[in-house]
Amino acid sequence: MAHKKGGGSTKNGRDSNPQYLGVKAFGGQEVSAGSIIVRQRGTAFKPGKLVGIGRDHTIFALQSGKVFFRSGRNNKKFVDIIPA
């Protein structure tokens, strides 16, 4: 006879890794070319002047300058870079 009970199984014990999404450079902040400005799922923020968008919808600076957030038509949010 076993002197300890067998270890049961559980349906818990998993957790996903953090995503680290959100705005990384705020309005008025100086950024260099290639800097990530926003990490997002989908296009909550859209690329404006001198800003690119990655495959995973990451918004990044194409040129060095100041970050500028603005609202376009239909309350769409755009991110621009104003060159220094």
UniProtKB/Swiss-Prot annotation:
This is Large ribosomal subunit protein bL27. Residues 1-21 are annotated as: Disordered. GO terms for molecular function: structural constituent of ribosome. One of its GO terms (biological process) is translation. Keywords: Ribonucleoprotein, Ribosomal protein. It comes from Chloroherpeton thalassium (strain ATCC 35110 / GB-78). Pfam families: Ribosomal_L27. InterPro entries: Ribosomal_bL27, Ribosomal_bL27_CS. HAMAP family: Ribosomal_bL27. Belongs to the bacterial ribosomal protein bL27 family. Gene3D superfamilies: 2.40.50.100. The keyword Isomerase does not apply. SUPFAM superfamilies: Ribosomal L27 protein-like. GO terms for cellular component: ribonucleoprotein complex; ribosome.
